[in-house]
């Protein structure tokens, strides 16, 4: 059997996260069911990481093995015929070496967070964005974002249930950009703790909305105290943008 890599996109709104759960709809569950229909046998998939309930992906990476002889283009069409109605799309398929693992071979990951920062919008424009009524300062937000660059202990922005042995993560890029009525936060890191990006976002927004000192964010980061982090930002505005490999 050859190992197949798939680039996939999905709307996480209707799912209880990526990882399979016996009694709840998940992205992994839907893909494995689709593969079983085609392969006629159970297929286990592996991913670059697990997105939480409500979080979307533009280019998630998964791998799997199937025994049937089928051209990749035909496999892609067959999978999309099943998955598209469930808000999941196969973007690309290709063969990879058996030694490749979507999670452990990954070098960096990129996430984005979408903030709707305007009163002039249609109701559906907030579907995959976090609405903030107050006009936000891109300059203030970017000064806080600069604090994230480098290797830090992110205990403050970790979840109690996170089982990672080390809370140190390396952040390579973090920046806010204005795009029309939206403000987009982009962050690239070696990897991320459970709910880390949303916790960071919620804290930065709370500091900006309350007109607190920009230095407050750095103080909170360095405290390594979860109790100092502010309300975690909603999941519906978070996107896994891409995963980087050598």
From Swiss-Prot:
Q: List the disulfide bonds.
A: none
> Which keywords describe this protein according to UniProt?
Isomerase, tRNA processing
Q: Please write the reaction equations for the catalytic activity of this protein.
A: uridine(38/39/40) in tRNA = pseudouridine(38/39/40) in tRNA
**What EC class does the entry list?**
isomerase
Active-site residues? 52 (nucleophile)
Keyword tRNA processing, does the record have it?
Answer: yes
Q: Which residues form the signal peptide?
A: none
A Pfam match is PseudoU_synth_1
Q: What is its EC number?
A: 5.4.99.12
The cross-references to SUPFAM superfamilies, in alphabetical order and at most eight, read:
Pseudouridine synthase (SSF55120)
Q: Which residues cross the membrane?
A: none
UniProt: substrate binding residues: 111
Q: Which domain of life is it from?
A: Bacteria
Please cite one Gene Ontology biological process associated with this protein.
tRNA pseudouridine synthesis
Q: Name one GO molecular function term.
A: RNA binding
Q: How does it assemble?
A: Homodimer.
Which HAMAP family does the record associate with it? TruA
What does the sequence similarity comment in the record state about its family?
Answer: Belongs to the tRNA pseudouridine synthase TruA family.
What NCBIfam families does this protein's entry cite?
hisT_truA
Function text: Formation of pseudouridine at positions 38, 39 and 40 in the anticodon stem and loop of transfer RNAs.
Q: What is this protein called?
A: tRNA pseudouridine synthase A
Record lineage:
Bacteria, Pseudomonadati, Spirochaetota, Spirochaetia, Spirochaetales
> Gene of origin?
truA
């Amino acid at each position: 059997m050859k190992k197949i890599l798939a680039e996939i996109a999905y709307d996480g709104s209707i799912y209880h996260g990526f990882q399979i759960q016996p009694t709840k709809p998940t992205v992994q569950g839907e893909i494995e069911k689709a593969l079983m229909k085609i392969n006629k046998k159970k297929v286990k998939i592996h991913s670059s990481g697990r997105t939480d309930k409500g979080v979307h992906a533009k280019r998630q990476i998964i791998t799997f093995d199937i025994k049937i002889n089928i051209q990749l283009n035909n496999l892609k069409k067959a999978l999309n015929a099943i998955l598209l109605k469930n808000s999941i799309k196969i973007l690309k398929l290709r063969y990879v070496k058996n030694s490749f693992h979507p999670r452990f071979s990954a070098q960096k990951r990129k996430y984005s967070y979408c903030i709707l920062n305007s009163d002039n919008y249609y109701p559906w424009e907030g579907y995959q964005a976090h609405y903030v009524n107050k006009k936000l300062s891109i300059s203030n937000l970017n000064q806080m974002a600069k604090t994230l660059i480098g290797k830090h202990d992110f205990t403050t922005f970790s979840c109690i249930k996170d089982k990672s042995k080390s809370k140190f993560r390396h952040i390579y890029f973090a920046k806010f950009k204005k795009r029309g009525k939206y403000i987009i936060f982009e962050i690239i890191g070696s990897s991320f703790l459970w709910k880390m990006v949303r916790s960071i976002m919620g804290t930065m927004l709370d500091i900006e909305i309350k007109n607190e000192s920009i230095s407050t964010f750095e103080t909170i980061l360095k405290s390594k105290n979860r109790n100092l982090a502010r309300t975690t930002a909603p999941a519906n505005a978070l996107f896994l943008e891409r995963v980087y490999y050598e």
